[in-house]
Regions:
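Conserved AAA+ ATPase small/helical "lid" subdomain
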Residues: 63-139
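Helical mechanochemical/support elements of P-loop NTPase systems and associated helical scaffolds
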Residues: 21, 33-40, 44, 50, ...
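C-terminal engagement/docking regions of AAA+ P-loop ATPases
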Residues: 107, 127-277
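Residue-identity detector for threonine
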Residues: 35, 42, 54, 62, ...
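Generic alpha-helix detector with strongest preference for long hydrophobic helices that associate
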Residues: 6, 21, 25, 29, ...
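Canonical AAA+ ATPase core
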Residues: 3-79, 121-133
Length: 277
């Protein structure tokens, strides 16, 4: 191989055979070799004309574009799938949060494969939830993010001195992403009316078994919720559908909780939001 690359010939039983090949050899390598095998030997490395160090996507938009290009989101023909842009952005932001986390090994790296896998598992969980409820409309919601730690754990290396903190660290990454997307898309001046409604002893339950229509009724019950929901769905094609409204409502409620504007009690796949007063 070394001779072919450099001298374009090879020795066969003492006879030199010319191989004037017009080829280009391109090789890729991971940031870290886990087995200490398969490293490029120095003479071979010397034959490469250039060594190019690439990097992960530097911004969320690029990460989202890769997700949309690479993720396999095919579902059964009798299901109607729509993934809100803000949900895909949350998935991409989880990956960026992992790349900045001191609890995640940056030497091992956090590949874009994490974003792709998380998008696919998010949709898979939404499909499961829709089938259980007997609905053919599939729109991922905040409750579907509970599946992400399982798909994330196998693609990152967690560094912590404390045993059993893996789940907590991964859940924290998801929460960071939800809060970041909430702050980016929901104007602060739309929060006040929603928080005021909860201060009047309003309690709202969410969960996998809560139907899309229940969120439409919630929107009528809390008129102030319409402004932040509209801000999230303003660029969505199917903004008026109950499933899209449900997804946006859950992000608003979860975002307000993470911003310390609402209290939340969670247990057994359900959550209850109430005022902090």
């Amino acid at each position: 191989l070394l001779n072919v690359l450099e001298e374009r010939d090879v020795q066969i039983r003492g006879h030199k055979v010319r191989l004037p090949l017009d080829v280009i050899l391109v090789a890729s390598a991971n940031p870290e070799d886990y087995t200490n095998r398969g490293r490029l030997i120095t003479p071979l490395k010397d034959r490469f004309g250039s060594q190019i160090r690439t990097h992960y996507p530097l911004d969320i938009d690029t990460e989202v574009a890769i997700i949309e290009q690479e993720a396999d989101l095919s579902v059964s023909a009798d299901l109607d799938l729509t993934v809100p842009a803000f949900m895909t952005e949350i998935v991409a932001t989880v990956t960026h949060a992992a790349r900045a986390s001191q609890h995640i090994s940056q030497r091992s790296g956090v590949s874009v494969r994490l974003s792709i896998a998380n998008e696919e598992i998010l949709v898979a969980n939404a499909v499961r939830r829709s089938l259980r409820s007997g609905s053919s409309r599939v729109v991922p919601r905040i409750v579907d993010l509970e599946a992400l730690p399982a798909s994330t754990s196998g693609k990152v290396e967690i560094e912590t001195l404390e045993e059993g903190r893996d789940g907590e660290i991964l859940a924290s990454l998801v929460s960071q992403a939800v809060l970041a997307v909430f702050k980016d898309h929901v104007p602060p001046d739309t929060h006040r009316g929603v928080v005021d409604a909860f201060e009047e002893d309003l309690v709202v339950d969410i969960g996998e078994d809560v139907t899309d229509d229940a969120y439409v009724r919630l929107l009528k019950q809390i008129p102030a919720l319409e402004a932040p929901v509209h801000a999230l769905l303003i660029d969505e094609e199917d903004a008026e559908s109950p499933a899209m409204i449900a997804s946006a409502c859950e992000l608003v409620l979860e975002g307000l909780h993470l911003a310390k504007r609402l209290n939340k009690d969670a247990a057994a796949g359900r959550a209850q939001f109430r005022g902090r007063g």
